[in-house]
Amino acid sequence: VASYRMEFSPDLSVKVIVTENPIIGAVSWEHNRYYFDRYGYVMAKNIDISSTVPVVDGSNFTNVSLYEQLGGVKSSLAEDILQLTQLLDDNEIAADSISYDEKMQAVIALGDVKVSLGSRDNMTDKIAELCAILDSGELSGLKGTLHLENCGDGSTSSYIFDRE
């Protein structure tokens, strides 16, 4: 619950208005899809939602339970997942999926384009650069991998796109 408000009326009735935290991501685990909020709490299971949220895979969850925080992964990976899904949500980027390899390097899928983000370092800068690229329309109609692993490290502001 993000917030609640109570309204009292003269006829002695009470109206309670509850606002939930928005769902910002999903996890596929044991043939189910679990949806979580920006704090990592699992809010729903196997529902149809109107908004597009990224599906996280590539992480080794040992337990996912409704109304509890995502568990069973290294806390640093859980923090990375939450940071990335929150940045995507805040910047209104609708990723199809998010995956992590064994070195905890993040890759997001945006239709036919995969975006290799690398490690958690400078993730805010990487997402800002991705926003600028998406806004420019440079990726429209392309298929391949956009490399932003080194973005924000001070070495260069350019990026590499490998066409398929």
Tell me the role of every PLM-derived stretch.
Residues 3-164:
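Charged, solvent-exposed interaction patches on well-folded alpha/beta domains
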